[in-house]
Amino acid sequence: KPVGLVGDLAPVEAAFALKELIEGQGGSVECRTDGAHLPAGNRSGYVGTASIADIDSAGAIMLIGCNPALEAPVLNARIRGAWSRGAKVGVVGEAVDLTYEYFHLGSDRAALDKLVAGDNSDALSRETLVILGQGAIREADGAAVLAKAMAFADHTESKFLVLHSAASRVGAMDVGAVTEGGLAAAMEGADVVYNLGADEIEIGDGAFVIYQGSHGDRGAHRADVILPGAAYTEENGLFVNTEGRPQLALRAGFAPGEAKENWAILRALSGELEAKLPYDSLAQLRQALVKAGPHLA
Protein backbone atom coordinates (compact mmCIF):
# COMPACT_ATOMS: atom_id res chain seq x y z
CA LYS A 1 0.00 0.00 0.00
CA PRO A 2 1.15 3.59 -0.59
CA VAL A 3 1.74 5.87 2.39
CA GLY A 4 2.20 9.64 2.37
CA LEU A 5 4.20 11.45 5.05
CA VAL A 6 3.84 15.21 5.52
CA GLY A 7 7.00 16.99 6.70
CA ASP A 8 7.23 19.90 9.12
CA LEU A 9 7.46 22.67 6.49
CA ALA A 10 4.91 21.54 3.89
CA PRO A 11 2.27 24.13 2.98
CA VAL A 12 -1.39 23.21 3.38
CA GLU A 13 -1.89 23.04 -0.39
CA ALA A 14 0.79 20.35 -0.76
CA ALA A 15 -0.53 18.35 2.21
CA PHE A 16 -4.03 18.48 0.73
CA ALA A 17 -2.84 17.40 -2.72
CA LEU A 18 -0.78 14.56 -1.22
CA LYS A 19 -3.78 13.35 0.78
CA GLU A 20 -6.01 13.30 -2.29
CA LEU A 21 -3.37 11.56 -4.41
CA ILE A 22 -2.41 8.86 -1.90
CA GLU A 23 -5.91 8.15 -0.62
CA GLY A 24 -7.07 7.95 -4.23
CA GLN A 25 -4.62 5.08 -4.65
CA GLY A 26 -5.98 3.28 -1.59
CA GLY A 27 -3.26 4.47 0.78
CA SER A 28 -3.05 6.54 3.94
CA VAL A 29 -1.42 9.83 4.90
CA GLU A 30 0.09 10.93 8.21
CA CYS A 31 1.44 14.31 9.34
CA ARG A 32 2.18 13.47 13.01
CA THR A 33 5.59 12.11 12.10
CA ASP A 34 7.02 12.77 15.58
CA GLY A 35 4.43 10.47 17.15
CA ALA A 36 2.43 13.25 18.82
CA HIS A 37 -0.91 11.99 20.13
CA LEU A 38 -3.04 14.76 18.69
CA PRO A 39 -6.73 13.90 18.15
CA ALA A 40 -7.86 13.88 14.53
CA GLY A 41 -11.13 15.71 13.96
CA ASN A 42 -11.10 17.54 17.31
CA ARG A 43 -9.72 21.00 16.59
CA SER A 44 -10.06 22.10 20.21
CA GLY A 45 -7.75 19.18 21.07
CA TYR A 46 -4.98 19.81 18.54
CA VAL A 47 -5.21 23.63 18.47
CA GLY A 48 -7.02 24.62 21.64
CA THR A 49 -9.49 27.32 22.56
CA ALA A 50 -7.15 30.26 23.16
CA SER A 51 -5.46 32.83 20.98
CA ILE A 52 -1.89 34.04 21.40
CA ALA A 53 -3.28 37.45 22.36
CA ASP A 54 -4.90 35.86 25.42
CA ILE A 55 -1.42 35.65 26.96
CA ASP A 56 -1.41 39.43 27.37
CA SER A 57 -4.48 39.45 29.63
CA ALA A 58 -3.79 36.22 31.52
CA GLY A 59 -3.54 36.36 35.30
CA ALA A 60 -2.02 32.89 35.49
CA ILE A 61 -0.25 30.75 32.88
CA MET A 62 0.35 27.01 33.26
CA LEU A 63 3.05 25.52 31.02
CA ILE A 64 2.88 21.74 30.59
CA GLY A 65 5.66 19.87 28.83
CA CYS A 66 7.04 22.80 26.88
CA ASN A 67 10.00 25.17 26.82
CA PRO A 68 8.71 28.29 25.06
CA ALA A 69 12.09 30.02 25.40
CA LEU A 70 13.48 27.43 22.99
CA GLU A 71 10.40 26.38 21.01
CA ALA A 72 8.73 29.77 20.53
CA PRO A 73 10.89 32.70 21.70
CA VAL A 74 8.46 35.41 20.53
CA LEU A 75 5.60 33.75 22.39
CA ASN A 76 7.88 33.41 25.41
CA ALA A 77 8.48 37.16 25.31
CA ARG A 78 4.72 37.69 25.56
CA ILE A 79 4.59 35.35 28.56
CA ARG A 80 7.37 37.40 30.15
CA GLY A 81 5.34 40.53 29.47
CA ALA A 82 2.32 39.02 31.23
CA TRP A 83 4.56 37.97 34.13
CA SER A 84 5.94 41.51 34.41
CA ARG A 85 2.35 42.73 34.76
CA GLY A 86 1.71 40.35 37.65
CA ALA A 87 0.70 37.06 36.06
CA LYS A 88 1.74 33.90 37.90
CA VAL A 89 3.48 31.21 35.84
CA GLY A 90 3.52 27.52 36.73
CA VAL A 91 5.53 24.77 35.04
CA VAL A 92 4.96 21.03 34.86
CA GLY A 93 7.99 19.66 33.06
CA GLU A 94 11.71 20.22 32.93
CA ALA A 95 12.99 23.14 35.01
CA VAL A 96 14.67 25.48 32.51
CA ASP A 97 15.59 29.15 32.22
CA LEU A 98 12.50 30.89 30.82
CA THR A 99 13.79 34.45 31.55
CA TYR A 100 11.11 34.94 34.23
CA GLU A 101 10.23 33.43 37.58
CA TYR A 102 7.80 30.52 37.81
CA PHE A 103 6.50 27.90 40.22
CA HIS A 104 7.95 24.49 39.33
CA LEU A 105 5.35 21.87 40.19
CA GLY A 106 7.36 18.83 39.09
CA SER A 107 8.64 17.15 35.97
CA ASP A 108 6.82 13.81 35.86
CA ARG A 109 3.34 12.47 35.25
CA ALA A 110 2.67 12.43 39.00
CA ALA A 111 3.07 16.21 39.06
CA LEU A 112 0.42 16.54 36.36
CA ASP A 113 -1.91 14.18 38.23
CA LYS A 114 -1.42 16.24 41.38
CA LEU A 115 -2.17 19.43 39.45
CA VAL A 116 -5.39 18.01 38.01
CA ALA A 117 -6.57 16.52 41.31
CA GLY A 118 -5.37 19.29 43.61
CA ASP A 119 -6.72 22.57 44.89
CA ASN A 120 -7.20 24.82 41.86
CA SER A 121 -8.66 27.79 43.72
CA ASP A 122 -5.86 30.08 42.58
CA ALA A 123 -6.44 29.21 38.93
CA LEU A 124 -10.20 29.62 39.38
CA SER A 125 -9.73 33.11 40.80
CA ARG A 126 -7.66 34.30 37.85
CA GLU A 127 -7.90 34.50 34.06
CA THR A 128 -5.87 31.34 33.47
CA LEU A 129 -4.25 30.04 30.29
CA VAL A 130 -2.93 26.49 29.90
CA ILE A 131 -0.21 25.93 27.27
CA LEU A 132 0.61 22.33 26.34
CA GLY A 133 3.83 21.50 24.47
CA GLN A 134 4.57 18.69 22.02
CA GLY A 135 7.08 17.12 24.39
CA ALA A 136 4.22 16.18 26.70
CA ILE A 137 2.28 14.20 24.13
CA ARG A 138 4.93 12.35 22.12
CA GLU A 139 5.31 9.47 24.56
CA ALA A 140 3.15 6.35 24.63
CA ASP A 141 0.76 7.94 27.14
CA GLY A 142 0.52 11.20 25.20
CA ALA A 143 -3.24 10.90 24.69
CA ALA A 144 -3.75 10.57 28.45
CA VAL A 145 -1.53 13.58 29.13
CA LEU A 146 -3.52 15.64 26.62
CA ALA A 147 -6.79 14.53 28.22
CA LYS A 148 -5.56 15.51 31.70
CA ALA A 149 -4.37 18.92 30.51
CA MET A 150 -7.73 19.55 28.83
CA ALA A 151 -9.54 18.34 31.96
CA PHE A 152 -7.57 20.80 34.10
CA ALA A 153 -8.40 23.62 31.69
CA ASP A 154 -12.07 22.64 31.70
CA HIS A 155 -12.29 22.36 35.50
CA THR A 156 -10.63 25.72 36.06
CA GLU A 157 -12.51 27.34 33.16
CA SER A 158 -9.14 28.18 31.63
CA LYS A 159 -8.32 28.82 28.02
CA PHE A 160 -6.23 26.11 26.38
CA LEU A 161 -3.49 26.37 23.74
CA VAL A 162 -1.40 23.65 22.10
CA LEU A 163 2.10 24.90 21.29
CA HIS A 164 3.19 23.37 17.99
CA SER A 165 6.77 23.00 16.81
CA ALA A 166 6.01 22.01 13.19
CA ALA A 167 4.79 24.76 10.86
CA SER A 168 2.76 22.35 8.74
CA ARG A 169 1.06 20.39 11.52
CA VAL A 170 -2.14 22.31 12.19
CA GLY A 171 -2.93 22.88 8.52
CA ALA A 172 -2.27 19.25 7.63
CA MET A 173 -4.57 18.11 10.42
CA ASP A 174 -7.19 20.60 9.28
CA VAL A 175 -7.32 18.90 5.86
CA GLY A 176 -7.35 15.41 7.39
CA ALA A 177 -3.81 14.26 6.59
CA VAL A 178 -3.96 11.77 9.45
CA THR A 179 -4.42 8.04 9.92
CA GLU A 180 -6.31 6.42 12.77
CA GLY A 181 -3.69 4.86 14.98
CA GLY A 182 -1.01 7.38 14.03
CA LEU A 183 2.32 6.86 12.33
CA ALA A 184 2.72 3.20 13.26
CA ALA A 185 -0.67 2.31 11.79
CA ALA A 186 0.03 4.30 8.64
CA MET A 187 3.41 2.66 8.04
CA GLU A 188 2.21 -0.89 8.71
CA GLY A 189 2.46 -2.88 5.48
CA ALA A 190 3.70 0.09 3.44
CA ASP A 191 5.43 -0.87 0.21
CA VAL A 192 5.64 2.66 -1.23
CA VAL A 193 6.35 5.70 0.95
CA TYR A 194 5.84 9.18 -0.50
CA ASN A 195 7.89 11.40 1.78
CA LEU A 196 6.91 15.08 1.49
CA GLY A 197 9.87 16.65 3.26
CA ALA A 198 9.75 14.57 6.45
CA ASP A 199 13.40 14.43 7.52
CA GLU A 200 12.90 13.60 11.20
CA ILE A 201 11.74 10.03 10.68
CA GLU A 202 13.69 6.82 10.10
CA ILE A 203 12.11 4.77 7.32
CA GLY A 204 13.04 1.11 7.54
CA ASP A 205 14.23 -1.15 4.76
CA GLY A 206 11.81 -2.75 2.35
CA ALA A 207 9.61 0.10 1.20
CA PHE A 208 10.23 2.01 -2.03
CA VAL A 209 10.71 5.64 -0.97
CA ILE A 210 9.93 8.72 -3.05
CA TYR A 211 11.29 11.89 -1.47
CA GLN A 212 9.91 15.28 -2.46
CA GLY A 213 11.71 18.16 -0.82
CA SER A 214 14.30 20.90 -0.96
CA HIS A 215 17.26 19.70 1.12
CA GLY A 216 19.63 16.74 1.03
CA ASP A 217 18.67 15.70 4.53
CA ARG A 218 17.92 12.30 6.05
CA GLY A 219 14.81 11.77 3.94
CA ALA A 220 16.67 12.32 0.68
CA HIS A 221 19.45 9.92 1.68
CA ARG A 222 16.91 7.14 2.25
CA ALA A 223 15.05 7.78 -1.02
CA ASP A 224 14.97 5.61 -4.12
CA VAL A 225 13.61 8.52 -6.17
CA ILE A 226 14.04 12.24 -5.43
CA LEU A 227 11.68 14.89 -6.78
CA PRO A 228 13.13 18.37 -6.08
CA GLY A 229 10.49 20.64 -4.58
CA ALA A 230 10.52 24.29 -3.65
CA ALA A 231 11.46 25.36 -0.13
CA TYR A 232 8.85 27.32 1.81
CA THR A 233 10.66 30.52 0.80
CA GLU A 234 10.40 29.62 -2.89
CA GLU A 235 6.64 29.21 -3.34
CA ASN A 236 3.42 30.85 -2.25
CA GLY A 237 1.77 28.74 0.40
CA LEU A 238 -0.78 28.62 3.17
CA PHE A 239 0.20 27.73 6.73
CA VAL A 240 -1.92 27.56 9.88
CA ASN A 241 -0.23 28.80 13.04
CA THR A 242 -0.32 27.35 16.54
CA GLU A 243 -3.53 29.20 17.46
CA GLY A 244 -5.28 27.91 14.32
CA ARG A 245 -5.07 31.08 12.24
CA PRO A 246 -4.45 30.66 8.47
CA GLN A 247 -1.49 32.71 7.25
CA LEU A 248 -0.21 33.25 3.73
CA ALA A 249 3.50 32.88 3.00
CA LEU A 250 4.72 34.67 -0.12
CA ARG A 251 7.59 33.55 -2.31
CA ALA A 252 10.87 35.34 -1.60
CA GLY A 253 12.83 33.80 -4.47
CA PHE A 254 12.52 31.22 -7.22
CA ALA A 255 13.42 27.58 -6.73
CA PRO A 256 16.74 26.59 -8.35
CA GLY A 257 17.30 24.14 -11.16
CA GLU A 258 14.50 21.69 -11.90
CA ALA A 259 12.70 22.20 -8.58
CA LYS A 260 8.97 22.87 -8.87
CA GLU A 261 6.23 24.05 -6.55
CA ASN A 262 5.22 21.16 -4.35
CA TRP A 263 1.54 21.08 -5.26
CA ALA A 264 2.44 21.15 -8.96
CA ILE A 265 4.69 18.08 -8.64
CA LEU A 266 1.84 16.15 -7.06
CA ARG A 267 -0.61 17.35 -9.71
CA ALA A 268 1.76 16.27 -12.52
CA LEU A 269 2.32 12.88 -10.90
CA SER A 270 -1.42 12.32 -10.59
CA GLY A 271 -1.70 12.74 -14.35
CA GLU A 272 0.97 10.10 -14.94
CA LEU A 273 -0.95 7.74 -12.64
CA GLU A 274 -4.14 8.40 -14.64
CA ALA A 275 -5.71 9.71 -11.43
CA LYS A 276 -5.65 13.39 -12.31
CA LEU A 277 -6.27 15.77 -9.43
CA PRO A 278 -9.08 18.21 -10.32
CA TYR A 279 -7.09 21.45 -10.38
CA ASP A 280 -4.62 22.96 -12.82
CA SER A 281 -3.60 26.06 -10.89
CA LEU A 282 -2.91 27.12 -7.33
CA ALA A 283 -6.11 29.18 -7.38
CA GLN A 284 -8.19 26.13 -8.35
CA LEU A 285 -6.49 24.04 -5.67
CA ARG A 286 -7.28 26.67 -3.04
CA GLN A 287 -10.91 26.67 -4.12
CA ALA A 288 -11.05 22.92 -3.49
CA LEU A 289 -9.16 23.41 -0.22
CA VAL A 290 -11.58 26.03 1.07
CA LYS A 291 -14.52 23.86 0.04
CA ALA A 292 -13.11 21.08 2.23
CA GLY A 293 -12.20 23.46 5.08
CA PRO A 294 -14.07 26.79 4.92
CA HIS A 295 -12.13 28.21 7.88
CA LEU A 296 -8.98 28.15 5.71
CA ALA A 297 -10.34 30.91 3.46
Q: Which residues make up each language-model segment?
A:
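Cofactor-cradling patches in redox/metallo enzymes
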Residues: L5-A15, L70
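Non-catalytic alpha/beta scaffold blocks inside enzyme catalytic domains
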Residues: Q25, V29, T33-L296
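Short glycine-rich phosphate-binding loop at a beta-alpha junction
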Residues: P2-G7, L129-I131
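Phosphodiester-processing cores and adjacent nucleic acid-binding clamps
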Residues: K19
